[in-house]
């Protein structure tokens, strides 16, 4: 009996349908490690089963018929037993495959493969052929200069709007206050004992080349970063015919390229590099560590350098949601779908972008729009109807903002809810006011994720009776049961190093950016509010509140 696991999105979506792919949320959110969160397809005795995270599982409604479903992970809602054990990816696969050998596609990310191999025997198919590489060097100072030149120009263009925000004068200053560049990454590598990093995800390689991810992907680039060195080494499958990339040689493949670099230890992106690609590196004798934390922490620490892009993205979302609300109100008696609301939202975003010189530089990496009656999971907007009778319609919107060279410099993660009932709307607005007036100002450098979560839950206590009166707390549960995050830091993708959750010891630092949020899912009600903040020594400053600067 042969059990096959297909990992490439091309194969999985080819089998399960394009509409299924369009409804997936998390492969878009995890821009640097899509396949580490994407569904996989397991075939056993002629039966196909998709293995998918619960957060993305609403997409299974539209996959082709005749395919089974195995779900792992857990997404918070009040009706679940959050103390129950959480099923892992490997368990979900083994529940289908059994204890025997799994024939696994070599495209699976290394970290997923390692978890699967710990659960039982695994063999690989579809191994990649070695690819010759062109080797280049680029001065990191040139990349940092590109960052500053584009940042300063965009900050000047957007300053008139930022000045209108509450605390606008401080926020305007913050847009050009720091230029940390690669410095924090040097320090993190030294702290962790990493003499070199090898970066493979196009989303991350952008920041080491000054080229947009699409160009990185087309050229087949990876980069070798050595802390403190003036040049970054770039490996490319195709020639790079640019004067700022100095050609220094060629090599037969990645194993030779890394083997030649004289390092005993190299940190790699284990959540991105495929097990097939990694298999070729065994002959090098190098010990490969995981670079995920160092990359995320660096991006968190340098996000303040690019504050203008985060300020723009967050406020563009709010303008878009305003446009969608107005469209919904005008057409409330007609037939409207979630995608109609998204179209109206993007029109509002585009108007805002054109006004401040960001036209053609704004993209979407998630559009979560749906009623609480449709699902409590973070589902991408689809062809589902929305009606005035829907008690809540959630918007949780992710935009990317690029600089003039096409490199993504900032993103949004902002949420609001259309509420049909006055009491629910009042509660939504109260939660939002708690975020911007109480929780965000309480965030200070040196606080852990657990400490911020504790404050966030404490601020909910005065509302507990109101939640209960409105039927928004199950019998026997109180606000202490709010085990969802109250927010997180943010960088060039939503995935970051600090989440405001119980048990998280990682700390926020001065100059970091992030989002605070409350998401309240129960029954057919889904209330979501989320606002952006900048960490300062005096406390956090919200950058999504209009008012006198």
Which ranges hold each PLM region?
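Active-site neighborhoods and metal-handling regions in enzymes and metal-associated proteins
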Residues: 1-549
């Amino acid at each position: 009996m042969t059990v096959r696991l297909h990992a490439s999105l091309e194969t999985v979506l080819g089998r399960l349908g394009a509409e299924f792919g369009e409804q997936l949320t998390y492969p878009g959110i995890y821009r640097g490690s899509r396949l580490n969160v994407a569904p996989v397809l397991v075939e056993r005795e002629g039966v196909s089963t998709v293995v998918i995270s619960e957060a993305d599982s609403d997409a299974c409604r539209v996959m082709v018929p005749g395919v089974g479903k195995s779900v792992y992970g857990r997404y918070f809602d009040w009706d679940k037993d959050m103390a129950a054990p959480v099923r892992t990816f490997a368990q979900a696969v083994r529940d289908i495959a059994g204890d025997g050998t799994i024939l696994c596609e070599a495209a699976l990310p290394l970290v997923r493969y390692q978890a699967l191999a710990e659960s039982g025997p695994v063999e690989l198919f579809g191994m990649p052929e070695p690819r010759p590489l062109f080797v280049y060097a680029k001065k990191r100072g040139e990349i940092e200069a590109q960052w500053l030149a584009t940042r300063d120009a965009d900050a000047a263009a957007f300053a008139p709007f930022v000045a209108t925000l509450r605390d606008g004068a401080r926020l305007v200053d913050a847009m050009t206050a720091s230029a940390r560049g690669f410095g924090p990454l040097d320090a993190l590598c030294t702290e962790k004992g990493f003499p070199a990093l090898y970066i493979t995800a196009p989303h991350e390689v952008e920041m080491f080349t000054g080229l947009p991810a699409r160009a990185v992907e087309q050229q087949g680039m990876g980069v070798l970063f050595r802390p403190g060195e003036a040049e970054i080494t770039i490996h490319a499958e195709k020639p790079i015919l640019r004067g700022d990339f100095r050609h220094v040689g060629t090599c037969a493949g990645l194993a030779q390229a890394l083997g030649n670099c004289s390092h005993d230890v190299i940190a790699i992106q284990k959540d991105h590099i495929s097990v097939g690609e990694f298999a070729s590196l065994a002959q090098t004798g190098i010990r490969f560590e995981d670079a995920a934390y160092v990359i995320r922490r660096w991006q968190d620490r340098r996000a303040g350098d690019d504050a203008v892009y985060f300020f723009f993205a967050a406020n563009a979302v709010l303008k878009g949601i305003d446009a969608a609300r107005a469209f919904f109100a005008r057409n409330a008696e007609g037939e409207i779908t979630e995608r109609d609301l998204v179209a109206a939202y993007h029109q509002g975003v585009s108007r805002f972008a054109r006004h401040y010189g960001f036209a053609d530089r704004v993209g979407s990496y998630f559009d979560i729009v749906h009623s609480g009656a449709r699902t409590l999971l973070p589902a991408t907007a689809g062809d589902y109807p929305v009606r005035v009778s829907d008690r809540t319609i959630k918007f949780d919107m992710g935009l990317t903002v690029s600089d003039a060279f096409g490199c993504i410099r900032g993103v949004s993660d902002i949420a609001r809810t259309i509420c049909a009932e006055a009491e629910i709307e009042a509660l939504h607005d109260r939660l939002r006011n708690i975020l911007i007036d109480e929780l965000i100002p309480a965030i200070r450098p040196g606080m852990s994720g657990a400490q911020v979560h504790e404050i966030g839950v404490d601020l909910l206590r005065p509302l507990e009776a109101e939640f209960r009166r409105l039927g928004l707390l199950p019998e026997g549960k109180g606000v202490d049961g709010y085990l969802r995050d109250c927010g997180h830091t943010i960088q060039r993708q939503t995935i970051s190093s600090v989440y405001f959750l119980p048990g998280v010891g990682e700390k926020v630092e001065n100059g970091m950016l992030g989002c605070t949020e409350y998401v309240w899912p129960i029954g057919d009600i889904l209330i979501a509010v989320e606002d952006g903040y900048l960490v300062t020594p005096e406390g956090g400053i919200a950058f999504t509140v209009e008012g006198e600067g």
